[in-house]
Design a protein with these regions (language model features):
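Helix-to-beta-strand junctions that scaffold the AdoMet/dcAdoMet cofactor pocket
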Residues: 69-72, 85-86
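Class I S-adenosylmethionine-dependent transferase superfamily signal
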Residues: 80-81
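Short catalytic micro-motifs in class I SAM-dependent methyltransferases
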Residues: 64-68
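Carboxylate-rich, divalent-cation-coordinating active-site regions
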Residues: 52
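Class I (Rossmann-like) S-adenosyl-L-methionine-dependent methyltransferase catalytic domain
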Residues: 1-49, 73-76, 89-173
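A conserved beta-strand element that flanks and buttresses the S-adenosyl-L-methionine
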Residues: 61
């Protein structure tokens, strides 16, 4: 909901989907706080089909979403995003270097698989870690190609942990 609200602040017609009715209800309430009624603009995604027509969106955004699910589900979701998107797709994905911030993983290994988070933040959710090869695997069965890609890595200098995210713009050919 936060991106839907942000885009509306800029005067852009925006819509959102989520798998959780609770998240949608919270987004609607959050929107009211900023003076926006987004109730008609947010819908449930049933895990199979995004409830919008083909090429409905000029562009789509997925901020910190596709890495918070099993990789196989992300591959299914990106095909649906491909279906409803006319041209561009912006997404961010957690990088493999970020595994050191999760207590249950060994601190000296690069990890590109997925885990169930045990730490307080997002406890019980799936976290899937990415490198460029895994990103290419994610998009290979879509019409998207990487137009722009950056990886931002931050270091906590006190405990020497790193957190990184890929930021990508995908373009339909």
């Amino acid at each position: 909901g936060r991106i839907t609200i942000l885009l509306r602040e800029f005067g852009i017609n925006s819509y959102g989907v989520d798998i959780s009715q609770t998240a949608i209800d919270e987004a609607v309430e959050f929107g009211k706080h900023f003076g926006f009624d987004i109730k008609d603009g947010v819908k449930i995604y049933d895990g199979n089909k995004i409830p919008y027509n083909d090429n409905f969106f000029d562009f789509t955004i997925s901020e910190s979403v596709m890495d918070s699910m099993p990789f196989e589900l992300a591959k299914k979701l990106i095909k649906e995003i491909d279906r409803v998107t006319k041209k561009y797709f912006f997404l961010s994905l957690i990088s493999s270097e970020s595994n050191k911030i999760f207590n249950q993983l060994e601190n000296n290994k690069i990890f590109i698989d997925e885990i169930e988070v045990e730490d307080e933040h997002e406890k019980g959710t799936i976290q899937s870690f990415f490198n460029l090869e895994k990103i290419e695997e994610l998009i290979k069965s879509t019409n998207f190609k990487i137009k722009w890609c950056e990886k931002h890595t931050l270091e906590n200098v006190l405990n020497k942990t790193h957190h990184g995210r890929y930021y990508l713009v995908l373009e339909k050919e």
